[in-house]
């Protein structure tokens, strides 16, 4: 049987692709030699019998002329039988082929996905091994040899195998090789709908046991297949299902996947191969009529589920809105306004409700007790009638919703508001110009001592004193009996400082923040020290003036 040369192998695949045609040819040659040896023994026996019966040389020459023709028929028959037994044995192995293949039958090369990957998803060349997998999708190059014994052998066909893509295939499917037995436009015979299921009579896709083509696939395209491909490796007790992509002829033409649908499914699984879930297929490879793709079938359910959840609070809100708004009974003043409003509008040319209500309010207060008692009696009757009409009503029904909305809006901002309100009176958050410009408003009522801040402001050293007070260090707490004053007080403030020292009150020119009322009384030395330490905690400026304690 002819073998492929090296040039033919380079044309069929890439340099790193494993194509072993020589070993396959040698194995087939060995098989053919064994068969011919057995037939040679039979021929020798038959020739001996014929020579014993016919002792003429003419009969021997006739038998030698007749032998080649039956031998050719026997060779083709034995060849076909071996082919089917080999295919059956390989099918029982689980769809993966361990022995070499015939040279005329190309095979699918799928890399071992357990090996390490490169960063871009392709397999590393050093660690690349291949799994030989059946591709039960397209035509059989040697199928014509079973129909016609005069057809060329697969070895002759494999030299002319073009690597093209079927016209009816989806662009996502990888490149396949097929023999020139079928043109690209015509589908092969085993994919035509003439193949009927003997039980159901429905056109079906042939089972992998009936097909035996192996199609080469470049490792670069398979390198992008994601690792957890459970549909590639058959589980125990499961058969290998054909992959039904958008380009292959579907057993049910109405359920065939178009290009958009197959692209949608391919985006969920793999950029090159579009698997069909095995649970949607029968044992014969026929998809269930109600299932096209489980992914597409689940999307409407996912879209319908959120509205179901959102509709549950909807009826409650609608029921609350449908409840009639019950007005509260009118009080005496409202009854008076209802009666006198038309008169006021007729007397005055005012159209503003605020002005009209003001006039009505003045007139209501000008009424005597007897006149008002009449309206109070009407209001009491109004309340009784309202309680009879609406026994379970309360004013909270009308105001509960509004208060609840206000609470929901204010829950997030209430802690910040309280903290800001407490910090607003603090002088440290105000600019220093405002502190100096308006000392009387913030500090005038703080201390009831003879030394008021106004007397301190009258001196030229007052601004420096405020700055020094803001820069008081924490070491002031070490000497509780003594209080820092200016090292050189001016003559104008000497009387105030002496009077303050005799009274025992601290005389800082300006305090950094207002004091509570509990500290307005003359404090003890301990309270004074705590007060100064508390104010010193809020100061951030460095020490600018050296202060000395006065004895």
From Swiss-Prot:
Keywords: Activator, Developmental protein, DNA-binding, Nucleus, Repressor, Transcription, Transcription regulation, Wnt signaling pathway. It is found in: Nucleus. InterPro entries: Catenin-bd_sf, CTNNB1-bd_N, HMG_box_dom, HMG_box_dom_sf, TCF/LEF. Residues 19-32, 63-76 have a biased composition (Basic and acidic residues). Residues 326-394 bind DNA. Residues 1-11 have a biased composition (Gly residues). Residues 1-76, 298-326, 392-525 are annotated as: Disordered. Its main location: nucleus. Residues 469-478 have a biased composition (Polar residues). Residues 46-61, 449-468, 493-505 have a biased composition (Low complexity). Pfam families: CTNNB1_binding, HMG_box. One of its GO terms (molecular function) is DNA-binding transcription factor activity, RNA polymerase II-specific. GO terms for cellular component: beta-catenin-TCF complex; chromatin. GO terms for biological process: brain segmentation; canonical Wnt signaling pathway; cell proliferation in dorsal spinal cord; embryonic pattern specification; endothelial cell fate specification; generation of neurons; heart development; hindbrain development. The keyword Nucleus applies. Belongs to the TCF/LEF family. Participates in the Wnt signaling pathway. Probably binds to DNA and acts as a repressor in the absence of ctnnb1, and possibly as an activator in its presence. Regulates anterior-posterior patterning in the neuroectoderm by repressing posterior neural fates. Also required for hindbrain morphogenesis. Interacts with ctnnb1. This is Transcription factor 7-like 1-B. It comes from Danio rerio (Zebrafish). The gene is tcf7l1b.
């Amino acid at each position: 049987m002819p073998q492929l040369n090296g040039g033919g192998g380079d044309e069929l695949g890439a340099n790193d692709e494993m194509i072993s045609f020589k070993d396959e040819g040698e194995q087939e040659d060995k098989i053919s030699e064994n068969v011919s040896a057995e037939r040679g023994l039979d021929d020798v026996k038959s020739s001996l019998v014929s020579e014993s019966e016919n002792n003429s040389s003419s009969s021997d020459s006739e038998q030698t002329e007749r032998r080649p023709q039956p031998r050719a028929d026997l060779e083709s028959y034995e060849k076909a039988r071996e082919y089917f037994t080999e295919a059956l044995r390989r099918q029982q192995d689980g769809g993966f082929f361990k022995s070499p293949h015939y040279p005329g039958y190309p095979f699918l090369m799928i890399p071992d996905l357990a090996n390490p990957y490169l960063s871009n998803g392709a397999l590393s060349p050093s660690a690349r091994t291949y799994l030989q997998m059946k591709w039960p999708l397209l035509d059989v190059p040697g199928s014509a040899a079973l129909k016609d014994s005069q057809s060329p052998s697969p070895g002759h066909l494999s030299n002319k195998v073009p690597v093209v893509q079927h016209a009816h295939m989806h662009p996502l499917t990888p490149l396949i090789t097929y023999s020139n037995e079928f043109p690209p436009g015509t589908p092969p015979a085993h994919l035509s709908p003439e193949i009927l299921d003997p039980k159901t009579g429905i056109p079906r896709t042939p089972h992998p046991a009936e097909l035996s083509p192996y199609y080469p696939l470049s490792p670069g395209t398979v390198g992008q297949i994601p690792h957890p491909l459970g549909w590639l490796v058959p589980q125990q007790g499961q058969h290998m299902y054909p992959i039904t992509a958008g380009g292959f002829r579907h057993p049910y033409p109405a359920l065939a996947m178009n290009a958009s649908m197959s692209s949608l499914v391919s985006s969920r699984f793999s950029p090159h191969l579009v698997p069909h879930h095995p649970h949607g297929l029968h044992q014969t490879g026929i998809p269930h009529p109600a299932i096209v793709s489980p992914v597409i079938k689940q999307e409407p359910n996912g879209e319908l589920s959120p509205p179901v959840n959102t509709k549950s609070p909807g009826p409650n809100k609608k029921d609350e809105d449908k409840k009639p708004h019950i007005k509260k009974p009118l009080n005496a003043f409202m009854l008076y306004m209802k009666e006198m409003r038309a008169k006021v509008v007729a007397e005055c040319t005012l159209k503003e409700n605020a002005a009209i209500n003001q006039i009505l309010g003045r007139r209501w207060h000008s009424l005597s007790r007897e006149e008002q008692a009449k309206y109070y009696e009407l209001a009491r009757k109004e309340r009784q009638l309202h309680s009879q009409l609406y026994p379970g009503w309360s004013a909270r029904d009308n105001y509960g919703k509004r208060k609840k909305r206000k609470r929901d809006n204010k829950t997030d901002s209430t802690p910040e508001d309280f903290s800001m309100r407490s910090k607003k009176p603090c002088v440290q958050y105000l600019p220093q110009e405002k502190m100096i410009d308006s000392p009387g408003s913030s500090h005038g009522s703080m201390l009831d001592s003879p030394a008021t801040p106004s007397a301190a402001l009258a001196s030229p050293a007052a601004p420096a004193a405020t700055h020094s007070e803001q820069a008081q260090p924490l070491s002031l707490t070490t000497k509780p009996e003594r209080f820092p004053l200016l090292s050189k007080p001016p003559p104008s403030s000497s009387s105030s400082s002496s009077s303050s020292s005799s009274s025992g009150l601290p005389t800082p020119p300006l305090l950094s923040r207002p004091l509570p009322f509990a500290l307005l009384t003359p404090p003890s030395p301990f309270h004074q020290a705590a007060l100064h330490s508390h104010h010193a905690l809020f100061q951030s400026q460095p020490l600018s003036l050296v202060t000395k304690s006065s004895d």
